[in-house]
UniProtKB/Swiss-Prot annotation:
Gene3D superfamilies: Biosynthetic peptidoglycan transglycosylase-like (1.10.3810.10), DD-peptidase/beta-lactamase superfamily (3.40.710.10). The keyword Metal-binding does not apply. Residues 327-605 are annotated as: Transpeptidase. The active site is at residues 94, 365. Residues 664-691 have a biased composition (Basic and acidic residues). GO terms for cellular component: outer membrane-bounded periplasmic space; plasma membrane. This is Penicillin-binding protein 2D. The chain crosses the membrane at residues 20-40. The gene is pbpG. It is a single-pass membrane protein.
Length: 691
């Protein structure tokens, strides 16, 4: 009996020793694993806490234009820019011991495990704020052991490398609050239409309850349930002595008013402008569209919301709703190149294709001011005379000819001045000028004005047969308005990252690239399209809208069978309109042919309403005299016609009109400039000049 007892005792002691040994070994192994994890975490250092954030675009007045979010609305804000109650409420309901543990709340974990065992189900969570933050940053929300291991590993790394406030700030900026809102700032805007720092304490307490289950605790889904959870949170704050009982009662009783959910989904403002701003961002920052849309950038654009609204409303009010005709519109500040308003089509939802910046259309006669700028620079003056008559131009020695015509087949059948030729849009005068200068000159001049299209040096180029982008034509006119300084259409003035660091700022430096005197004289002549005193064999091209205008503008219209243009400016604003059909169908309706001019005139008047009149100021080297616009003579005593016209100093007309009938002009009177020898033979034949 004793032998059996001793044997059992020895066996029991061996078993106990074995368990002690195995327990000690397991403890050492666990400690070794734990220390290894700690050391690896320490070696790897701070994990990245970068998360996708919404990029916001602002209008020139600082108001919000739009945002990009890739489906996740997220705006990072520091703790100091949150109502303190959101912090207290979140800690109270999610992790009471947050400031005391090192990432894991072991007591809470044990309690949760015991509760789960009793219920034979997962009934209580034990994840700390740090664990949830790690899960939000790095992990998928599956329930595998691998995910649990990685969560623990990232939790350790976060606790090792970031302060409690940094972890809490990150958590509050990444947790999901429902309806696409990630982070407390997005949630504040979504539910209450305000910034997180402006939340009331009651609103903050309600929001703190949503992340546990956005599909159940969102007030949009179940307001009663959301209020019940808010009450639970407030009482927990009271229990943890974060607030008094009186304060708790007040918060529970406070009525809450929510933003209507349907207001959160709205049409993007100025969508065509928005797309151009995004394209410019890609170019300026060297980033992909996805990088831009998820980097939390603050993009300050150039759009003037008032002018944008005027442009959109003017187009809608002018164009017949039943017509399929399209419109491209842009307005530019000549002083900076800033695009103030842009419309790329009549309905962005139906067609996001931008007819202002992406399409190329024949500019027609709107190209003529660029030609005449070069002519003035080359010795022409506003009173240079050339005959307007039906003309067949011999292009080369092979006998090829070019026979342009004037609108409706009207001709003066006598010499007219450059001033009048521009106001009446005489095509014969334009082609003669183009050929006299050399067809390559207009190609080079267009490049100086910022035209990027490849233009062919054809005789017809003077009449705008080579397609260009409408916005580049408006920009070219803006360069005439600013006296010849180089500008480019600009959509973005400044970009900062989420922390406020400047990533890009438009330098706003503009080099003088055009002849200032020639640019001013050209701009001055362009005011003639609205001046009925310049009527001749036909009316000035702006006669139909002259009575709509209350200011001095310079401008030029243009027409092809499929395109209708109007571009014009004053010193502060340049704007242009193109109308036509996407498939190049002809514009047959008289009403549709008038759209471009009407839209331009009404926009300019409304956009500048309340602004002081700004005069075109001549630069040094330019002088003004009164002339007879038909003969080109200076207006002396007794001369009936008097039109104030600017000239490059020294090129004013020598002849004077005294009222008597002047000698009839029958030949072209061109600058006494020697032409290239290659042009002399055919030019002399039709020009009637002899050497």
């Amino acid at each position: 009996m004793d032998a059996m007892t001793n044997k059992r005792l020895r066996l029991t002691l061996k078993t106990v020793r074995a368990f002690i040994f195995l327990g000690a070994f397991a403890a050492l192994a666990a400690a070794a694993v734990f220390m290894t994890v700690i050391l690896i975490a320490k070696y790897q250092g701070a994990p990245s806490v970068q998360v996708p954030q919404s990029t916001i675009l602002y209008a020139s007045d600082g108001s919000k234009l739009g945002e990009t979010n890739y489906g996740e609305k997220r705006y990072w804000v520091p703790l100091k820019d949150m109502n303190p109650t959101i912090v207290k409420a979140t800690v109270a309901i999610e992790d009471q011991n947050f400031y005391d543990h090192h990432g894991f709340d072991y007591k809470r974990m044990a309690g949760a495990a015991l509760a789960d065992l009793k219920a034979f189900a997962k009934v209580q969570g034990a994840s700390t704020i740090t664990q949830q933050y790690a899960r939000n940053l790095y992990l998928e929300h599956d329930k595998t052991w691998k995910r649990k291991w990685n969560e623990a590993f990232y939790t350790i790394r976060l606790e090792q490398n970031y302060s409690k406030d940094e972890i809490l700030e990150g958590y509050l900026n990444t947790i999901y609050y429902g309806h696409g809102a990630y982070g407390i700032e997005a949630a504040s805007r979504l539910y209450f239409g305000k910034h997180a720092k402006n939340l009331t304490d009651a609103e903050a307490a309600l929001l703190a309850g949503i992340p546990k289950g956005p599909s159940g605790y969102s007030p949009y889904v179940n307001e009663t349930k959301a209020k019940e959870r808010q009450k639970t949170i407030v009482r927990m704050m009271e229990k943890q002595q974060m607030i008094s009982q009186k304060k708790a009662d007040e918060l529970i009783k406070e009525p809450l008013s929510y933003q209507p959910l349907n207001k959160q989904v709205s049409k993007r403002k100025a969508p065509y402008f928005y797309d151009n701003a995004m394209r410019e961002l890609e170019k300026k920052l060297g980033m992909t569209r996805e990088q831009i849309e998820t980097s939390g950038l603050n993009v300050y654009t150039t759009v003037d919301k008032r002018m944008q609204r005027i442009a959109e409303e003017t187009i809608t009010e002018t164009v017949n709703a039943g017509s399929d005709i399209q419109v491209g519109f842009s307005a530019i500040d000549p002083r900076t190149g800033n695009v103030l308003a842009l419309v790329g089509g009549r309905d962005y939802q139906k067609s996001p294709f931008d007819r202002t910046t992406q399409a190329k259309r024949q500019p027609a006669s709107t190209i003529k001011p660029l030609l005449y700028y070069k002519a003035i620079q080359s010795g022409f003056t506003p009173v240079t005379l050339m005959k307007s008559e039906e003309t067949e131009f011999q292009i080369d020695a092979k006998g090829e000819t070019y026979s342009p015509s004037n609108y409706n087949g009207y001709y003066a059948n006598k010499p007219i001045t450059l001033l009048q030729a521009l106001a009446l849009s005489d095509n014969i005068y334009a082609v003669k000028t183009h050929l006299f200068l050399g067809t390559n000159k207009l190609v080079k001049t267009a490049k100086e004005f910022g035209i990027t299209a490849h233009l062919q040096a054809l005789p017809s180029l003077a009449l705008g047969t080579e397609p260009v982008r409408p916005i580049e034509m408006v920009n070219a006119y803006a360069m005439l308005a600013n006296g010849g300084k180089k500008i480019e259409p600009t959509f973005i003035s400044r970009v900062t990252d989420a922390a406020g660091h400047v990533l890009y700022e438009n330098p706003n430096q503009h080099k003088q690239v055009l002849d200032e005197k020639a640019a001013f004289v050209t701009a001055s002549m362009m005011t003639g399209m609205f001046d009925i005193d310049l009527n001749g064999y036909t009316s000035v091209t702006g006669r139909t809208i002259a009575n709509r205008l209350t200011r001095t503008y310079a401008g030029k219209s243009g027409t092809t069978s499929a395109d209708s243009w109007m571009i014009g400016f004053n010193p502060k604003l340049a704007a242009g309109v193109w109308t036509g059909y996407d498939k190049n169908s002809t514009i047959d309706s008289v009403e549709e042919k008038s759209y471009a001019k009407t839209i331009w005139a009404d926009f300019m008047e409304d956009a500048l309403k309340g602004e002081p009149e700004t005069a075109f100021k001549p630069p040094k080297g330019v002088t003004g005299v009164y002339i007879d616009p038909e003969t080109g003579y200076s207006s002396g005593p007794g001369c009936a016609a008097k039109h104030y016209t600017y000239f490059v100093k020294g090129t004013e007309p020598a002849n004077v009109c005294y009222g008597a009938e002047p000698a009839k002009q029958t030949k072209d009177r061109l600058p006494s400039k020697e032409k290239p020898a290659s042009e002399k033979k055919w030019w002399d034949k039709w020009l009637g000049r002899h050497h």
